[in-house]
């Protein structure tokens, strides 16, 4: 906490960006964006050129009768297990109104280190689903919304890959990761009834 560099500021709560009050101000809707290095903004030139930073600027352009406060709760290398700990041990104490989870890539990488057996995919993704079901249930109890999103990566969607992207796809065994990604995608439907929203981006 309380670290300041030319392109990065870490506030008193340990999040990237400006300070936030532990007690949420009146007429404020507080949103935590949670994920890994993509959310944190690795390589971004400033705090406001991260995903949460751009989102904050969009809301700042509109007068909707109350303040929307976007908090960058991204941590490089974070995956679902560490994100759950962050939510339970810190974020719940900061009066969230909404959690937006940008999820997937780091969990996929963790699985590659965990197992070389594709039969473990269902067990792995069931555990992932159960973690977020727990958080969504807490959201119901404590009156905050939870949005779970799956982040895209090379090979998902209908984009034609460049030679460089295709080479990277083969080098990193993305064909196996795509099987795992599809299993995550299928688990989203199991979260729909408990979470506020789920999306495969």
Locations of regions flagged by a protein language model:
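Membrane/wall-proximal cationic-aromatic binding patches
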Residues: 1-58, 62-63
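Alpha-helical cap/lid subdomain in secreted, periplasmic
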Residues: 53, 57-63, 81-201
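Structured loop/turn residues at beta-strand edges in well-structured enzyme cores
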Residues: 27, 66, 94
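A mature extracytoplasmic/lumenal domain signature
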Residues: 33-35, 74, 150
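Short beta->alpha junction loops
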Residues: 72-79
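Generic structural signal for residues in well-ordered beta-strands
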Residues: 68-70, 198
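Asparagine-centered polar/low-complexity signal
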Residues: 9-11, 72, 106, 185
């Amino acid at each position: 906490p309380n670290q300041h560099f030319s392109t990065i500021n870490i506030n008193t709560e340990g999040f990237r960006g400006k300070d936030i009050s532990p007690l949420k101000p009146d007429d404020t809707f507080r949103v935590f964006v949670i994920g890994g290095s993509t959310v944190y903004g690795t390589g971004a030139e400033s705090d406001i050129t991260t995903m949460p930073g751009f989102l904050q600027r969009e809301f700042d352009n509109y007068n909707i009768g109350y303040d929307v406060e976007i908090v960058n709760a991204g941590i490089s290398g974070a995956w679902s297990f560490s994100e759950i700990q962050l939510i339970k041990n810190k974020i719940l104490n900061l009066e969230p109104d909404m959690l937006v989870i940008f999820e997937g890539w780091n969990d996929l990488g963790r699985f590659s280190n965990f197992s070389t057996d594709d039969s473990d995919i269902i067990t792995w993704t069931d555990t992932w689903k159960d973690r977020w079901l727990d958080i969504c249930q807490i959201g119901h109890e404590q009156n905050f919304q939870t949005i779970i999103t799956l982040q895209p990566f090379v090979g998902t969607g209908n984009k034609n890959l460049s030679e460089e992207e295709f080479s990277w796809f083969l080098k990193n065994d993305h064909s196996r990761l795509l099987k795992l990604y599809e299993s995550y995608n299928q688990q989203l439907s199991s979260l729909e009834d408990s979470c506020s929203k789920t999306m495969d981006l």
